[in-house]
Swiss-Prot record:
Its EC number is 2.3.1.286. Its cofactor is Zn(2+). It comes from Ralstonia nicotianae (strain ATCC BAA-1114 / GMI1000) (Ralstonia solanacearum). Substrate binds at residues 74, 77. HAMAP family: Sirtuin_ClassIII. Residues 2-246 form the Deacetylase sirtuin-type domain. Its main location: cytoplasm. The keyword Cytoplasm applies. InterPro entries: DHS-like_NAD/FAD-binding_dom, NAD-dep_sirtuin_deacylases, Sirtuin, Sirtuin_cat_small_dom_sf, Sirtuin_class_III, Ssirtuin_cat_dom. It comes from the Bacteria. The gene is cobB. This is NAD-dependent protein deacylase.
Length: 246
């Protein structure tokens, strides 16, 4: 159960726990990026894409069947994300890492943490601006890919695909290992802007708590992670983190 403190006192209590910690794990979700104007996957698509469900486009099967359409959708997403800026929450998390040992684990693919100055970000779901080969001949080279929608290998015709984790795919092995290691060794697990509905990421706060960490949840709305938390702060991240992490 969360520690019994008033809503007004909760940020100060969180700050005290973080200051006393040697190792802090920060887990961020779509809510952090939403404060910068990045749509979440729960938001309805607009414009030319209004008739589609994002979960129907972000799959390997959809890409193999409609590669041009899905590639174009990701290109539009890249263009939109390129126009937004990191918000005060991103900046506060980056600043914390200049004076604390911080493992930053994110479910977001937009690269806003890196643009805010965070380094060594553990990207559980990949990166929107990266590409990788869907298949490959062993000689595929991104640098010499033939232009197209999508680009293809000049040797075998394999398609480039966005470097994100699609629905039904496993998390990157190294990123998942690093995230679990951070959960196992942190003193405080700060969970920001996630609904706690997407696994395996949603299991990390519980893993941290099982290993003795205090869990702090920051989210405007109640989430399933509130039951795991030692402290819950129902505020937007950009509002409370700058002072809480200063």
């Amino acid at each position: 159960m969360p520690t019994a403190v008033s809503d007004a006192a909760a940020p100060a209590q969180a700050r005290a726990w973080i200051e006393a910690a040697e190792r802090v794990m920060v887990l961020t979700g779509a809510g952090v990026s939403a404060e910068s104007g990045v749509p979440t996957f729960r938001d309805a698509l607009t414009g030319l894409w209004a008739r589609f469900n994002p979960e129907d486009l972000a799959t390997e099967a959809a890409y193999r069947e409609h590669p041009r359409m899905v590639w174009d959708w990701y290109q539009e997403r890249r263009a939109r994300v390129s126009q937004v800026q990191p918000n005060p929450a991103h900046l506060a998390i980056a600043a914390l890492a200049t004076r604390k040992t911080v493992a930053l684990v994110t479910q977001n693919v937009d690269g806003l943490h890196q643009r805010a100055g965070s380094v060594g970000v553990i990207e559980l779901h990949g990166n929107l601006f990266a590409n990788k080969w869907l298949d490959g001949c062993g000689k595929c080279d991104v640098a010499t890919a033939e232009p197209g929608r999508p680009p293809r290998c000049a040797a075998c015709g394999a398609m480039l695909r966005p470097g994100v984790v699609w629905f039904g795919e496993r998390l990157p092995v190294v990123a998942n290992y690093r995230a679990e290691e951070a959960a196992n060794t942190c003193d405080v697990c700060l969970v920001v802007g996630t609904s706690g509905m997407v696994y395996p990421a949603a299991g990390l706060p519980g893993l941290a708590k099982d290993h003795g960490a205090r869990v702090i949840v920051v989210n405007p709305e109640p989430s399933v992670l509130d039951e795991t938390a030692d402290l819950v702060i129902h505020q937007p991240a950009g509002v409370c983190l700058p002072a809480m992490l200063a």
